[in-house]
Structure formats: structure tokens, C-alpha cells
């Protein structure tokens, strides 16, 4: 088995690369994927988003080590174990990120990845329905749309934000991110539009693309060059040879794990694991970042929430309507309103994100109260806390050791306390007067800093946006793992391209930036000229230095 390019992982970036590397017919591509089929309602029905993440069949099911700042809780850290990777089990929320995110990447050493450089790739990948003209792509493979937003609670949330003095935005993925508006999702024709649907499945119809179901054990490195991948399938160890390059695209947990199993990583740690050190790169597995969030939940005085649809027999009606007609509530992830806000004067870009949901419910689908309600998923998205991914042993099948070190930076506590109080202010606006009942969570008795901190320690959870563990940077940065061309520093014929190479978190969900990374990396790999830099200037709040709104 051999191909010009061997891609480990069929996730957001891996699927995009498989398509772009093979589209001219000149190169052969093999995609290695351990996970199984994405066919079936649990993945394809948008409203069923809670199911695949709770199923071992689709999710690697990782847990963090006990988190000291969060009452030593082990935090769930899901990653997709299925065709399409995490794009097949995520919440389908589409956020490009803020322009300043990518400008920060370039400042951190990722030359050629500033906003002006990446915007053309976002446009190339998008098939936007109703986005801002001139800022959005309209003929790409990834369908992006807004929900119908028929529930009055969505509009109450947006109106409440305006009443509180915040901006509104018609398209947060266009020229103006800041403000309250309708949220976009990667769904189309009533179903999830994953990277597998957008990129991989069309690519697999080409004679030069092959998908191999297997477990990737390590990258084979000979004389300083990656020559293939050692895999296991059917109980046998085999080698898939790469005539040109091996591209690791296995997630922010498994990409550094694979590099370390291959002898690339912190030398002392590899020696402790009994692994021969091929390249001593201390940055492999370091720089782990993630978004955290909590649910702010309120009862509703009017029976307008989705609570009526939670009983099993009502869910059956939703499922049947989706199955036979691809219509109804099943066609949306129900995250149809949002906000991107700045936490304080002097903060230039939004750093607080809201997902609004017209029901009070946990991510696993359990109701928060036996009544109608609504909630906001609230997160401070520019945390300075950093963690690491390391090996548990030299056994390729052992789960990685994941230490996020959540809330280890004092600023995180200040920002999340502000998030609690800010949400109370928003939910307290006139737009919610007809709907607002008693507060469920955090609860009316949670008021002081100490009380809020106690709530946060017990209720903060991951937003499932890990990144940064194979950081992209300049070759003279000792903590960089890949250079701005996505090449692993010190090894020929080996690249990494997924969210693990992000130097820093983007402001928002990571599926969109991950796909963009695959799109752009493909041009680097093929040696193509980069798409022409954009000269469009995004909107920055003119009051940012003196006001938070």
C-alpha cells in the first residue's frame, strides 16, 4: 500500500486536504481512519447532536486528568472516532473567528497566516446562504446557513442585547463580528454537513483517493525522513508508504500523541516512555488551550420553549418528521441566536461568546427543570491558561494524558465572574419580561465573588475546542512544532495540519478554522501560489478603548 500523500485522520482538516490534494488527478492520496461510518440519524439529524458525543461508537471518550481548579473533576474531552472526525459529532456551529485572532497568529510566528491571508480560504470553502455579500464564499463545498429562528425566545435574546446597549450584527462571519445576532450552522437539506459530506465523500469517488480503516500506530521515520505510517488492521501490523509526504491530522490530542510515539517530542519524556528520540521538540504536546463555558438557565413563564418536545413520544414525532421529510425541529441544532461581546473597555476584540438555546437542558439531553425554560452557554474565549498532552505509555492504544490546567490564570476568574453578572443583566432586560421566571442556574443566592467561584468550580465545562499542541511558528522558536508551511521542524516529508497547529485560540468554535487550515495547508503541500491576500478591513468598534459596548 502506498500513495503520494498519506493523511492520518479524516476530520475537519484531513477531509479538506484529501479533496484538495487529489482534485487535479495528478497525485494519489490515502486517508487512514479508525472510526466507522457516519451514516445514521444520530449523526445526520442536527437536533440529535447530543447523541454521537455520548456514544463510544463515535467518540474516543477521553477524560482530562483531575483539574485542580475545578474541584479535581475530570473533564470530558470528546474527539470524533468516525468518518469526518469531530465534524461528525460536534454542535455544527460555524464561526470563522475574529480578524485579530489570525493577526495574532502571525505575531506569534505563523507568517502568512494573518487575517488577510486566511480570509480567501474561508471564502473558497464556504457555500454561504444569506451571508454578507462580498465577505462570504458562495460556491464552496461547505454549506453554511442560519436556522429559521421561529422561536420568540431567540428574538427576545437579540433584542435584550440591544436594550443593554450592545451592538447587533447581521453576519458575525462577515465584516462585523461583534454584537448580537443569528447563529450559523453547518447544515443543509435538513442534515449535518460535515467535512466528510463536504469534502471526503466526493473525493472518494475519484480513482486516486482511498480510505483505509485502520489504527495508526506511528509515523515511520528513516534517516530523518517520514516514509510511511505503521498501522494495525485485522490484528496485523502493516506499513502504508508515502511517496511524498505523511500528513498528521488526528486532533489536538492524537496528533501530538502520534508524533511522540514516532520519536518526535520532549526528549526526556520520550526516554521515560522507552521511546527512541528521533527529534527533540519540547513543544510537542505543550501549549494546550481550550474554551470553557457554563450554562446560565432561566425558567420561562410562557410555554414557548422546546420543553414540550422533550418527552420520548414527542421526540419520536420530531424524528419521524426528519426521517421522512427532512423537515421540522430535527433539521436544526437549535443554536440559532448568539452574541460576541467585549468584556471591558480597552478590549479590542470580542472575548465573550454566547450560544442561546430556547430550552433549559444539559448537553446530554437531560432537562434542567420540569418546566419551560431557556439558557445561554457562556464562555470567556481568550483564556491565558495553558495545559499539555503527554503519553501514558509507549502503547499506541493507551489514551493520552490530558492536563488542561483550566482556570490556572487569575484573569480567567475575573472574566467568568463578569460573565455571570453580565448574563443576569441581559436576561433582566425588558425583552425578557414576558418570559423571565426564576433563575435556575447559577441561582439567585449566587451573588458574591466567592459564591460565583464555587459555582464555577463545580459547573464549568469544556466547550470542546482544544488546540495548540503542535504549535505553528518560526523555526527559531524552540516551542514551535511546525513551520508556517505546516512542515514538522527537523523532519523531511512530515506535516501536521489540524487545530493542533494553532498558535493560539481563535475566538469561537474551531470547526471552521480547522477546515480552513486543511484548505490552506493543501496549497502549501502542493507548492501552489497562495490565494491573493484580501484587502478588506473588518469592523472594529470605534468605542473599544472607552466602552465595552
UniProtKB/Swiss-Prot annotation:
Pathway: Amine and polyamine biosynthesis; betaine biosynthesis via choline pathway; betaine aldehyde from choline (cytochrome c reductase route): step 1/1. It holds the Pfam family GMC_oxred_N. Keywords: FAD, Flavoprotein, NAD, Oxidoreductase. It comes from the Bacteria. Transmembrane segments: none annotated. Its cofactor is FAD. It is an enzyme of class 1 (oxidoreductase). The active site is at 465 (proton acceptor). GO terms for biological process: glycine betaine biosynthetic process from choline. It catalyses: choline + A = betaine aldehyde + AH2; betaine aldehyde + NAD(+) + H2O = glycine betaine + NADH + 2 H(+). Its EC number is 1.1.99.1, 1.2.1.8. FAD binds at residues 4-33. GO terms for molecular function: betaine-aldehyde dehydrogenase (NAD+) activity; choline dehydrogenase activity; flavin adenine dinucleotide binding. Involved in the biosynthesis of the osmoprotectant glycine betaine. Catalyzes the oxidation of choline to betaine aldehyde and betaine aldehyde to glycine betaine at the same rate. Belongs to the GMC oxidoreductase family. This is Oxygen-dependent choline dehydrogenase.
